[in-house]
Amino acid sequence: MAKIWELLDQTYYFIGKKHYAEAQSILDKILYADPQNVEAWDAYICICTTQRDLEGLKSYIANVWETRVQDQDYLQATQRFVLQRVDEKISSL
């Protein structure tokens, strides 16, 4: 697999072109390898354009944390931060 920063560069390229499916595919790979990557989660928030997308993302976040992240306080803080960013975007729609 390419380096995470290279994959993020590709992701932002696709986001800039509004090719969200391609961006999502790359983000899924990044988050599989590094489920705590806040920049990848932030990019994921960028590709969500509706409240329904964002609600789906919240479910996805919960699933990733349940299945892929160890139960440690600082990781829970990361989850709370990402969910807060999603809620902020929902409020702005």
Regions found by a protein language model. Give the residues of each.
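Alpha-helical segment of the N-proximal tetratricopeptide repeat
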Residues: 3-26
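Helix-start (N-cap) detector for alpha-helical repeat units in TPR-like alpha-solenoids
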Residues: 4, 38-39
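Conserved structural position within tetratricopeptide repeats
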Residues: 31-32, 66
